[in-house]
Amino acid sequence: MNIVILAAGTGKRMRSALPKVLHPLAGRPLLAHVIDTARTLKPTHLVVVIGHGAEAVRKAVAAPDVQFAVQEQQLGTGHAVQQALPLLDPSAPTLVLYGDVPLTRAGTLQALTDRAGQGGYGVLTVTLADPSGYGRIVRDAHGKVARIVEQKDATPEQLAIAEINTGIIVAPTERLGDWLAALKNDNAQGEFYLTDAVEMAIEAGLEVVTTQPDHEWETLGVNSKQQLAELERIHQRNVADALLVAGVTLADPARLDVRGTLECGRDVSIDVNCVFEGRVTLADNVTVGPNCVIRNANIGAGTRVDAFTHIEGAEVGANVVLGPYARLRPGASLHDESHVGNFVEVKNAVLGHGSKANHLTYIGDADIGARVNIGAGTITCNYDGANKFRTIIEDDVFVGSDTQLVAPVRVKRGATIAAGTTVWKDVEADALVLNDKTQTSRTGYVRPTKKKS
């Protein structure tokens, strides 16, 4: 089977310089969702027709299995499909999809192609309470499809029809090419309509068959920011419903955003206003507090992620406590039972089993062993303005508050760093390190006072 995805439109109502099909839904371009669905049908040829913003669209979705055809002038859907014909297998049927209709399910498309068979013409239709704006399916006295009439060309009687054309069709490729070549643009829009090929198919003796999706939202398209927002909420509701069915506890399904894939184990609980991006895995008994952002991360069993924690590109072990207001940046690896508390940032660093950094700390480019205590206000000074250096802290080290570790530096097993110390040389095992400081007290000191005006 061939699949053609039309993605050449300008999207004027979006009021944006970004091509319409590249506007994000759940964090990915609209067109990417359509391509993903198309791939599940295993087409032999997958062609995207591009036009407005062609190079940006090509760059955004380029892949070895995707071919591109260019529609230099946007002269209608029939003209767009014509541009793809040279790239198709003429002996296989062609399914036509739209780059701005992202929520159609693969099962719906499979049902349409199965109904049409190898040589039939199939149209996906929907019956709407309010069909305004859509082309109507006109049937004959026997209930068979006779033609499709666009809204602007319809008579008052035809406008009363509730069954509408979604634009998604499947047809025999070789014959479709002949029909498209015979299209005329004598209509209100002055365009070559793909829908006009229906009458030609009927005249050629083909019965045009139809199927309908299980849900109206499967065929909703995006022509404005309002419609984009509506589809975003529909998609997120569907994701939330699937998580609930799988046993995940959601404090409020309407306040969850998944912009990628979220895999959850048993007894996972997610509070409100959480965002998951990329590929995220939450193992059994993970609890995520409110207002967290987790991107491309794996969170181990029993871990608690408290409010306002941001995690990106991190590996988190089991029974870890994170936050509130913690930040894990790419390359962070937290072993089991470690703690990263409020206003602690970890980047490209390992925190060993049972180690704790509970307050106001920056840990960057560091390898920290097991059972290490990192006091409040500790900074690993990893950057000299040109190069990054690593800090190594071995097992059972105690680092006091307000410590600066100037990398490259190693603190060996069991050492103690006194509060307020700057460490710029390696520390031996079990040693106490402190910077000698003299404390001076003055009796009778009087604070300066402001002059009264």
Curated annotation (Swiss-Prot):
Annotated UDP-N-acetyl-alpha-D-glucosamine binding sites: 6-9, 20, 71, 76-77, 98-100, 135, 150, 165, 223, 329, 347, 362, 373
SUPFAM superfamilies associated with the record: Nucleotide-diphospho-sugar transferases, Trimeric LpxA-like enzymes
Catalytic activity: alpha-D-glucosamine 1-phosphate + acetyl-CoA = N-acetyl-alpha-D-glucosamine 1-phosphate + CoA + H(+); N-acetyl-alpha-D-glucosamine 1-phosphate + UTP + H(+) = UDP-N-acetyl-alpha-D-glucosamine + diphosphate
Molecular function as annotated in GO: glucosamine-1-phosphate N-acetyltransferase activity; magnesium ion binding; UDP-N-acetylglucosamine diphosphorylase activity
Pathway noted in the entry: Nucleotide-sugar biosynthesis; UDP-N-acetyl-alpha-D-glucosamine biosynthesis; N-acetyl-alpha-D-glucosamine 1-phosphate from alpha-D-glucosamine 6-phosphate (route II): step 2/2; Nucleotide-sugar biosynthesis; UDP-N-acetyl-alpha-D-glucosamine biosynthesis; UDP-N-acetyl-alpha-D-glucosamine from N-acetyl-alpha-D-glucosamine 1-phosphate: step 1/1; Bacterial outer membrane biogenesis; LPS lipid A biosynthesis
Binding site for Mg(2+): D100, N223
EC number: 2.7.7.23, 2.3.1.157
Linker: annotated segments: 226-246
Keywords linked to the UniProt accession: Acyltransferase, Cell shape, Cell wall biogenesis/degradation, Cytoplasm, Magnesium, Metal-binding, Multifunctional enzyme, Nucleotidyltransferase, Peptidoglycan synthesis, Repeat, Transferase
UniProt-annotated stretches for the region Pyrophosphorylase: 1-225
Cofactor(s) needed for function: Mg(2+)
One GO location term (cellular component): membrane
InterPro entries: Bifunctional_GlmU (IPR005882), GlmU-like (IPR050065), GlmU_C_LbH (IPR038009), Hexapep (IPR001451), MobA-like_NTP_Trfase (IPR025877), Nucleotide-diphossugar_trans (IPR029044), Trimer_LpxA-like_sf (IPR011004)
Broad class of enzyme this protein falls into: transferase
Pfam families, A to Z: Hexapep_2, NTP_transf_3
Metal-binding in keyword set: yes
Record GO biological process: cell morphogenesis; cell wall organization; lipid A biosynthetic process; peptidoglycan biosynthetic process; regulation of cell shape; UDP-N-acetylglucosamine biosynthetic process
Cofactor annotation comment: Binds 1 Mg(2+) ion per subunit.
Gene3D superfamilies xrefs: Hexapeptide repeat proteins, Spore Coat Polysaccharide Biosynthesis Protein SpsA, Chain A
Keyword Cytoplasm: yes
Family named by the database record: In the N-terminal section; belongs to the N-acetylglucosamine-1-phosphate uridyltransferase family. In the C-terminal section; belongs to the transferase hexapeptide repeat family.
Functional summary from the UniProt entry: Catalyzes the last two sequential reactions in the de novo biosynthetic pathway for UDP-N-acetylglucosamine (UDP-GlcNAc). The C-terminal domain catalyzes the transfer of acetyl group from acetyl coenzyme A to glucosamine-1-phosphate (GlcN-1-P) to produce N-acetylglucosamine-1-phosphate (GlcNAc-1-P), which is converted into UDP-GlcNAc by the transfer of uridine 5-monophosphate (from uridine 5-triphosphate), a reaction catalyzed by the N-terminal domain.
Protein name (Swiss-Prot/TrEMBL): Bifunctional protein GlmU
Native source organism of the sequence: Paraburkholderia xenovorans (strain LB400)
